[in-house]
From Swiss-Prot:
Reactions this protein catalyses: uridine(38/39/40) in tRNA = pseudouridine(38/39/40) in tRNA
Name of the protein in its database record: tRNA pseudouridine synthase A
The encoding gene: truA
Organism: Campylobacter jejuni subsp. jejuni serotype O:23/36 (strain 81-176)
Enzyme Commission number, as recorded: 5.4.99.12
InterPro entries, A to Z: PsdUridine_synth_cat_dom_sf, PsdUridine_synth_TruA, PsdUridine_synth_TruA_a/b_dom, PsdUridine_synth_TruA_C, TruA/RsuA/RluB/E/F_N
Length: 241
């Protein structure tokens, strides 16, 4: 028996979330099903969890498989036959037996994509259509998140976190063509943290919340915003070990 690391992407609009679901509608269920077609039935472990409608351009999972799978490129090709169209296997690597796909992670990155173009139903599941905003101001507000923070007011209920302390390495905004993108990198994220953060920044940009209130929420003094940004604009974009 050997352990492999699977790097893959997925279209979150096709699933009820990344974790296994009662009705087998999670990314984990679909990928486990694809593996079972190849005779790999060991439990599949995921590095990160995403909510319904959230996408991933770079996700990681691990699973045990038989030593006879020596040609990992061939395994990748065969696995894609059963994973498409909503999951794509980008790479498969052999890892050490003590590799922990979730707990060995050093950092995770997410991007939230806004489109400022005319609404398109074909893009609606993949971007958040939103009017243009002051990108410099957004960058200033996102900067408040950087550092070691107690983000208890940026967390949905139902998580299994032992602590709400997180270290944010990057929180910035940048433009690409007719899109604005928020980029977050941290040692870990709480459930709903990014969508709550994005929605809070938008509230300040809209004049519905003050900078002082945003800072107080980040400093865990008081919660002013309970709303989450829509899931469709959010992408898990990198996991580093």
């Amino acid at each position: 028996m050997m352990k492999i690391k699977i790097i893959f992407s997925y279209d979150g609009s096709a699933f009820l979330g990344s974790a296994s679901q009662p009705h087998k509608k999670g990314v984990q269920d679909a990928l486990s099903g694809a593996l079972s077609h190849l005779g790999i039935v060991s439990p599949l472990l995921m590095a990160s969890r995403t909510d319904k409608g959230v996408h991933a351009s770079y996700a990681v999972a691990s699973v045990g498989c038989g030593d006879h799978f020596v040609n990992l490129e061939y395994l990748q090709k065969q696995l894609n036959k059963f994973s498409h169209p909503f999951i794509h296997i980008k790479k498969i690597e052999k890892v050490k037996d003590d590799f922990e796909v979730r707990f060995d992670v050093k950092s995770r990155e997410y991007r939230y994509i806004f489109s400022h173009s005319s609404y398109s139903p074909f893009m609606a599941s993949y971007v958040h259509f939103y009017p243009k905003f002051d990108l410099d101001k957004a960058n200033e507000l996102l900067g408040f998140f950087v550092g070691k923070k107690d983000l208890k007011f940026f967390c949905k209920s139902g998580g299994d976190n032992k602590t709400t302390l997180r270290e944010i390495f990057i929180a910035r905004a940048y433009a690409y063509k007719d899109f604005s993108i928020f980029h977050f990198k941290a040692n870990g994220f709480l459930r709903g943290q990014i969508r709550l953060s994005v929605a809070s920044v938008l509230k300040v940009l809209e004049g519905k919340m003050s900078e002082k209130e945003l800072k107080e929420q980040i400093e865990a003094k008081k919660q002013y915003n309970h709303f989450l940004a829509p899931p469709n604009g959010l992408y898990l974009s990198r996991i580093c070990y």
